[in-house]
């Protein structure tokens, strides 16, 4: 079973992000807009209850987090992904760190860059065209997210599904 942990924003911000993703993100139908807290990791089916208990224990003392999408940015030249950058806060960093050590299904492969992906799978020309438009349009959205979401990848439907949400203090 493949799981992941994410912060999922309000419906209104999901709609704003999805207005780009529908056009520019081939992964659009697989998952809602989100900030990844724990990248996909694999467990045995019988370990799900244990993972849920570990998540509950690890979020203890973590407050609801402020998410402030500040501008369009990209991972170029590594890859042609465009995203809305989220300002890194101590609370976001702490939440990420609690789930990205050897004691919880391994360390993160990448440094923590909180963001909402809006475009991926682009050719270099597409990237240049789209990035200019998105950067010009800009973004300045702030909200409090008070739940951490545990997701499972459904192979049959080729998409991520919510297993459980956990209230942040």
Curated annotation (Swiss-Prot):
Record's keyword terms, sorted: Hydrolase
Coiled-coil stretches noted in the UniProt entry, renumbered to this chain: none
Any one Gene Ontology molecular-function term assigned to this protein's record: hydrolase activity, acting on ester bonds
Domain of life: Bacteria
Motif (HXTX 1): 34-37
Enzyme Commission code(s) on record: 3.1.-.-
Motif HXTX 2 location, chain numbering: 115-118
Record-annotated active site: 34, 115
Family annotation (HAMAP family): 2H_phosphoesterase_YjcG (MF_01444)
Family label: Belongs to the 2H phosphoesterase superfamily. YjcG family.
PANTHER family in UniProt: PHOSPHOESTERASE SAOUHSC_00951-RELATED (PTHR40037:SF1), PHOSPHOESTERASE YJCG-RELATED (PTHR40037)
Protein's name in the database: Putative phosphoesterase SaurJH9_1013
């Amino acid at each position: 079973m493949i799981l992941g942990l994410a912060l999922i924003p309000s419906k209104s911000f999901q709609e704003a992000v999805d207005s780009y993703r529908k056009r520019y993100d081939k992964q659009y139908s697989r998952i809602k807009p989100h900030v990844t807290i724990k990248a996909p990791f694999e467990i045995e089916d019988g370990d799900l209850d244990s993972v849920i208990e570990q998540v509950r224990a690890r979020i203890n003392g973590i407050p609801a987090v402020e998410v402030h999408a500040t501008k369009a940015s990209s991972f170029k030249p590594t890859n042609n992904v465009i995203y809305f950058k989220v300002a890194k806060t101590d609370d976001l960093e702490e939440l990420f760190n609690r789930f990205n050590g050897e004691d919880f299904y391994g360390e993160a492969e990448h440094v923590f860059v909180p963001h909402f992906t809006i475009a991926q799978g682009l050719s270099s020309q597409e990237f240049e065209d789209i990035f200019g438009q998105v950067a010009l349009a800009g973004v300045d959205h702030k909200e409090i997210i008070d739940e951490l979401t545990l997701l499972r990848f459904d192979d049959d439907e080729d998409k991520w599904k919510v297993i459980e949400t956990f209230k942040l203090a």
